[in-house]
Amino acid sequence: MEGMERPISEAYFQEAKRHIPGGVSSPVRAFKAVGGTPPFLVRGEGAYVWDADGNRYLDYVMSWGPLILGHAHPKVLARVRETLERGLTFGAPSPLEVALAKKVKRAYPFVDLVRFVNSGTEATMSALRLARGYTNRPYIVKFRGNYHGHADGLLVEAGSGALTLGVPSSAGVPEEYAKLTLVLEYNDPEGLREVLRRRGEEIAAIIFEPVVGNAGVLVPTEDFLKALHEAREFGVLLIADEVMTGFRLAFGGATELLGLKPDLVTLGKVLGGGLPAAAYAGRREIMEKVAPLGPVYQAGTLSGNPLAMAAGLATLELLEENPGYYRYLEDLGARLERGLKEVLAQKGIPHAVNRVGSMVTVFFTEGPVVTFQDAKRTDTELFKRFFHGLLDRGIYWPPSNFEAAFLSVAHTEEDVEKTLEALGEAL
């Protein structure tokens, strides 16, 4: 499979660039960090995708995280088809959103109320507005390399696509607005404590990725988590951004895995089962500030639309009914992590492999990689070789060194062995 040709994808890419900025609807898809032509995908099944040229790839992107069950899971498709026959969207309450809200509450016991939106950006943006409305305080704390979507107040020293493109924030974000976001180092508990001591009474909320996936995978230290919870002494709300980790690292996400107690949680990706859906959720006294109950306004034409609710409900039902899935993903992830380390060590390549459950990143630098600054030491030129060596052998890894790769329950041990063999050849 080495040296796959993609002339049809190349033609599509050139045409797309005439009609769509950069030829893509989200920047990282353009392969700017790695060069070359992105495969234009036309089909997915299980752990595999096919491009317009007919090439098959073992997929570790998994639509950037939502597809924990794999592509085109038959039970998810059946639920969506059944719902589709009844209508696409109504702009009205539906039984499906009630059922999905109840499922979220079972996964996150601290949650009393859930509000559905369409994207992770909407969820985090709305959660921050709510936090400010509830506390009557102006400032937000976020951490370098944590990505919370592209709302103006959060696109400040962000990770994900912003990091890949080499811009720590974005043009078009007013400096005055950005100043309301205090940016601290991730995994620096003393830095957080110092800011809380100095400015705690001005801070509405701290938003954080419990396990970072958008600067590559970064794992929180125990003392950092302890410092986060100490923020409550100052009346500061904790917002766990679980758009990526929710329902992926455990049924109750990183909140369950790490024993966290946030005030609000944002969810997305797996929540929608492959369709656009997200949510913010939390304690009753906070969530009751949201319109129509309270003065904090948020709305959306397609929020809670039946198709996304159906896909999400089918996905969460399967995850809840099959708790062994998470054990399987942990074991498979451990095998992948171990194998990656073995191959890279054999090749004499400096590396650090960070993994939590079914999320993994290979950094090409001496470890450990604990902070955003550590992650930025990675050899991005070597990553390009790693990426294209795998892609040419039918392995579709995320096209950025600052993104997590994802496993699904459709991946097998054979798939992992195939990946490791391809890596050995590629390097």
Swiss-Prot record:
- Predominant location category: cytoplasm
Q: Where in the cell is it found?
A: Cytoplasm
Query: Which branch of life, at top level?
Result: Bacteria
One annotated GO biological process: protoporphyrinogen IX biosynthetic process
List cellular component terms (GO). Answer: cytoplasm
What GO molecular-function term can you cite, just one? transaminase activity
> Disulphide bridges in this chain?
none
Known catalytic reactions: (S)-4-amino-5-oxopentanoate = 5-aminolevulinate
Which NCBIfam families does this one have?
A: hemL (TIGR00713), PRK00062.1 (NF000818)
Q: Which protein is depicted?
A: Glutamate-1-semialdehyde 2,1-aminomutase
Protein source organism: Thermus thermophilus (strain ATCC BAA-163 / DSM 7039 / HB27)
